[in-house]
């Protein structure tokens, strides 16, 4: 899978931009706040219909515009597929092969991506919500049905929580049980998919981590499932408690992940270097896992992370990804990028203007 071309209309600081990409490696070079990250954000938006930087859609539309559009050409094994995502006050419209997808869940996965940015360290040391979002994004690209179940679960959770905010005297437990059954139906599928995904991810990440640490460290990933027994029974047993708390206190919306090195919790006791290595191991593992599950390698987006890694980790990242994935890198300097291949494109970014260096 390769992204051959992208076109932006009123996206962030770009009024009208069209770029053709190298199938191997693309580097966006420039000082901070010039628009480098906006290009990777646009690719992320084209793939997932959402930004990785903001939840406020208005921020994505250029200040003088009322709507924006990101379109691209994705080269797959047997065809080149045009993709397009439009955003306006009316919402999102996603198209694949010029045909509108009625559900975003049917669109996501057309362009598979892996984003690696400095904030990815939050996967290890951040909040449980960050780790749940990680599972949801990656599983949504691999299995469209997971995204569907996740959306249905969140809708049912919202409905149950709204009902729990009623006065206790007005709550009908029979109706609450109906809501419980809807929640459990989709929640059980989510938990099964998450458990399977983490088990497979750990196999790949463990091997990579041992290579990165020369066999000195063993990585373990634990999926902490909030539901301990039967989801339906736990919801039923907690009805009185949930009515008192006015919220649903059990379910996959409270799941978490933990990372261990030699049986030591990395978030609590690991050094920053160890946390970075764990995050890197996971990202590299995802490359092979996505291929294993879908038959397609994802596109790798590296947003200002090379300066965060030492030369050894940089080399591991480049050697593992190149030859498998099309890679996009943003950076302020090439000084810390060692052993770059000759077949690449370099784009110079200055105040929203992009010039491609002659190859």
From Swiss-Prot:
Residues engaged in binding ATP: 30-37
Compartments where found: Cytoplasm
Gene Ontology CC: cytoplasm
GO MF terms, alphabetically ordered: ATP binding; single-stranded DNA binding
GO BP terms in the entry: DNA replication; DNA synthesis involved in DNA repair; double-strand break repair; SOS response
This protein's UniProt keywords: ATP-binding, Cytoplasm, DNA damage, DNA repair, DNA replication, DNA-binding, Nucleotide-binding, SOS response
Entries under PROSITE patterns matching the protein: RECF_1, RECF_2
InterPro entries: DNA-binding_RecF (IPR001238), DNA-binding_RecF_CS (IPR018078), P-loop_NTPase (IPR027417), RecF/RecN/SMC_N (IPR003395), RecF_2 (IPR042174)
A family per Pfam: SMC_N
Disulfide pairings: none
Record flagged with keyword Ribonucleoprotein: no
Gene3D superfamilies in alphabetical order: P-loop containing nucleotide triphosphate hydrolases, RecF/RecN/SMC, N-terminal domain
Main subcellular localisation: cytoplasm
Homology family: Belongs to the RecF family.
Protein purpose: The RecF protein is involved in DNA metabolism; it is required for DNA replication and normal SOS inducibility. RecF binds preferentially to single-stranded, linear DNA. It also seems to bind ATP.
This protein's name: DNA replication and repair protein RecF
Organism for this UniProt entry: Lactococcus lactis subsp. cremoris (strain MG1363)
């Amino acid at each position: 899978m390769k992204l051959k071309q992208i076109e932006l209309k009123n996206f962030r600081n770009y009024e009208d931009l069209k770029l053709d990409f190298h199938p191997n490696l693309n580097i966006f070079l420039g000082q901070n706040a010039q628009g480098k990250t906006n290009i990777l954000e646009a690719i992320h938006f084209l793939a997932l219909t959402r930004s990785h930087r903001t939840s406020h859609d208005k921020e994505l539309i250029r200040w003088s515009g009322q709507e924006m559009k990101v379109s691209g050409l994705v080269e797959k094994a047997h065809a080149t597929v045009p993709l397009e995502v439009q955003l306006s006050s009316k919402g999102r419209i996603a198209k694949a092969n010029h045909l509108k997808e009625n559900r975003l869940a049917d669109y996501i996965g057309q362009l598979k991506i892996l984003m690696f940015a400095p904030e990815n360290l939050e996967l290890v040391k951040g909040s449980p919500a960050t780790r749940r979002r990680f599972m949801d994004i990656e599983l949504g690209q691999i299995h469209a049905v997971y995204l569907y179940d996740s959306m249905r679960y969140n809708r049912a959770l919202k409905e149950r929580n709204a009902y729990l905010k009623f006065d206790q005297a007005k709550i009908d437990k029979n109706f609450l049980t109906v809501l419980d059954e809807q929640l459990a139906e989709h929640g059980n599928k989510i938990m099964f998919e998450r458990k399977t995904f983490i088990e497979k991810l750990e196999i790949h990440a463990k091997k990579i981590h041992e290579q990165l640490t020369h066999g000195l460290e063993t990585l373990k990933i634990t999926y902490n499932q909030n539901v301990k027994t039967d989801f339906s029974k736990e919801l039923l047993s907690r009805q009185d408690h949930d009515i008192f708390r006015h919220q649903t206190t059990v379910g996959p919306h409270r799941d978490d992940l933990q990372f261990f090195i030699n049986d030591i919790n990395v978030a609590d006791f690991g050094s920053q270097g160890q946390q970075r290595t764990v995050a890197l191991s996971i990202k590299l593992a995802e490359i092979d896992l996505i291929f294993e599950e879908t038959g397609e390698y994802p596109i790798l987006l590296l947003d200002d992370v090379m300066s965060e890694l030492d030369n050894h980790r940089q080399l591991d990242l480049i050697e593992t990804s190149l030859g498998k994935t099309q890679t996009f890198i943003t950076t302020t300097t090439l000084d810390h990028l060692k052993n770059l291949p000759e077949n690449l494109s370099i784009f110079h970014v200055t105040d929203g203007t992009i010039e491609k260096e002659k190859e």
